[in-house]
Amino acid sequence: MYTDKGANSDRMEFNTSKEVTVAPTFEDMHLKESLLRGIYAYGYESPSAVQSRAIVQICKGRDTIAQAQSGTGKTATFSISILQVIDTVVRESQALVLSPTRELATQIQSVIMALGDYMNVQCHACIGGTNIGEDIRKLDYGQHVVSGTPGRVADMIRRRHLRTRHIKMLVLDEADELLNRGFREQIYDVYRYLPPATQVVVVSATLPYDVLDMTTKFMTDPVRVLVKRDELTLEGIKQYFIAVEKEEWKFDTLCDLYDTLTITQAVIFCNTRRKVDWLTDKMREANFTVSSMHGEMPQKERDSIMQDFRQGNSRVLISTDVWARGIDVQQVSLVINYDLPTNRENYIHRIGRSGRFGRKGVAINFVTSDDVRILRDIELYYSTQIDEMPMNVADLLS
């Protein structure tokens, strides 16, 4: 392993396998002409640090572990790689992407469709909470790429509507969450149905040691493109805490903050569905315009809320961690942790909502006396310092 500071690394230090070279431009990756057109039409000019290292390795067929910060183009890293290796003449599933949430799976589908705009690519989002008949119809028609959640994908494979014999690549996005206890068995279920030579790509902002250890079960001699853990807290995101003496005082603190700030768009995180519903009602009673989302809402409702937020029709979204991983809304300038996350690794996914692709952002954590230990644990884990919020926080967001 060695530390590498190559093209577009923006001072991020990668602990990367020695054979990994840096491709400074997309042309240097020798991609299909139609794919290059899609990349430039999507708005990319040059590859990010993780893209310049990982895409070529994945396209060579190597099993790959790619770890980089939220907002650095991880989704495009594997999407471009998939589009390079599939054969669109063959209308069979050739790549499978598994994600922990329905929203993320749908977003990945839209990125693949956009990047593959000049390639006539078929990509279907195979997710729970949707009409199973639509899945069957789309899969029977033939999809080059399937982006889905583990439960529905496993179900479609078992029913033989998702045919796996042509699959050459499996991507596990947000792998730490996927491989947590909830999804582990479903991942193994899916993996058992894939051809033995299937290439595996693991992508995430955080890769705890136990996850890296577990990847040995289904990866062969993987190439690593890794960023050191203590580099993971996002550059460009200012982190603060507000000491709140009692839980009951958090709401007044939030209202005061809301009155003080001019917010483009903000996300407020709570730890439970019940808290999300309660806070949404309280904010509306106080005449604030907010929308909310959690995992137990019907999928159609979640889609509609996401659409409104993406289009800027709603400025503040209150959510559980279902929203914390990989959802890309460019205008988010502020994240408020109304509750500190119970899992310290979700902290980086939450605050990664603001300041994406080098934009500036602010993360504010509400901390009761019970939370001080959790805050210190987060600081230690990410080798970062979270300061008390200054009086002039409004200037930081302007």
UniProtKB/Swiss-Prot annotation:
Domain Helicase ATP-binding positions: 55-225
Compartment list: Nucleus, Nucleolus
Keywords recorded for this protein, A-Z: ATP-binding, Helicase, Hydrolase, Nucleotide-binding, Nucleus, Ribosome biogenesis, RNA-binding, rRNA processing
UniProt motif Q motif: location: 24-52
Source species, domain of life: Eukaryota
Statement: the UniProt record of this protein carries the keyword Magnesium: no
Listed GO MF terms: ATP binding; ATP hydrolysis activity; RNA binding; RNA helicase activity
Cysteine pairings via disulfide bonds: none
Enzyme Commission no: 3.6.4.13
Annotated Pfam families: DEAD, Helicase_C
Catalytic activity entry: ATP + H2O = ADP + phosphate + H(+)
Entry comment, domain topic: The Q motif is unique to and characteristic of the DEAD box family of RNA helicases and controls ATP binding and hydrolysis.
Protein name: ATP-dependent RNA helicase fal1
Organism: Aspergillus oryzae (strain ATCC 42149 / RIB 40)
Gene that specifies this protein: fal1
